[in-house]
Amino acid sequence: NKYCNIKCSKVAHTVCQTGESTKPSSKNCAKVSITSVGVTEEEKKLIVDEHNRFRQKVAQGLETRGNPGPQPAASDMNNLVWNDELAYIAQVWASQCQFFVHDKCRNTAQYQVGQNIAYSASTAAYPGVVKLIVLWENEVKDFNYNTGITKENFAKVGHYTQVVWAKTKEVGCGSIKYIEKGMKSHYLVCNYGPAGNVLGAQIYEIK
């Protein structure tokens, strides 16, 4: 497939490694009971709207949390749009059931691609996509804009910084919902183009 021509520092592309199917991996997914694969049209809209709502909140200087807060306003925040190719690659990876592991090569011909992963489970109902994105947003509480992202703080704030990375233009996500130990579980993989979280770069320009 065409993704076998896209290389990332000597690692084969996810879609080259796994094949082009978005069906759950029979080997890895056997340990859970999968109930749905993929994002609905409604979920796509919710994902884009929630990213842009939060990006605008930060851009307008309305995010009071931080270490220290508030976060400075931004002058260069792009509005995100959905990208089906990013979503497809994210879905191929989500369907591998390699929970909480980032794939090594997810780029497209157009973009270096970043990634956020989230998981939540409940006995009552499957947690929605907005709830999962809010988990990423909440990392702002540990973020110091002046320090930016470093190897030291990346694990604590890296999801937040990708959500609000100003130069990112497009997002696409894959999802699987499954039952594990009686819990209704939702696993979300979002891919971003162009990628954020470039060490040493500013997450956005201050207004």
From Swiss-Prot:
PROSITE patterns the UniProt entry points to? CRISP_1 (PS01009), CRISP_2 (PS01010)
Detail the disulphide connectivity of this chain as listed in its UniProt entry: C4-C16, C8-C105, C29-C97, C173-C190
Ranges of residues in domain SCP: 49-192
**Changes after translation:** Glycosylated.
Where Phosphotyrosine occurs, the residues are: Y111
Q: Name one Pfam family in it.
A: CAP
**Gene Ontology CC:** extracellular region
Task: State which tissues express it.
Answer: Expressed by the venom gland.
Q: Which UniProt keywords apply?
A: Allergen, Disulfide bond, Glycation, Glycoprotein, Phosphoprotein, Secreted
Enumerate the subcellular locations listed in this protein's record, separating them with semicolons: Secreted
- What's the chief localization of this chain? secreted
Q: Which Gene3D superfamilies does its entry note?
A: CAP
| Glycosylation positions in this chain | K141
The UniProt similarity line reads: Belongs to the CRISP family. Venom allergen 5-like subfamily.
Q: What else is known?
A: On the 2D-gel the determined pI of this protein is: 9.7, its MW is: 26.5 kDa.
Please report the name of this protein according to its UniProt entry. Answer: Venom allergen 5
User: What organism is this sequence from?
Assistant: Polybia paulista (Neotropical social wasp)
Upper taxonomic lineage? Eukaryota, Metazoa, Ecdysozoa, Arthropoda, Hexapoda
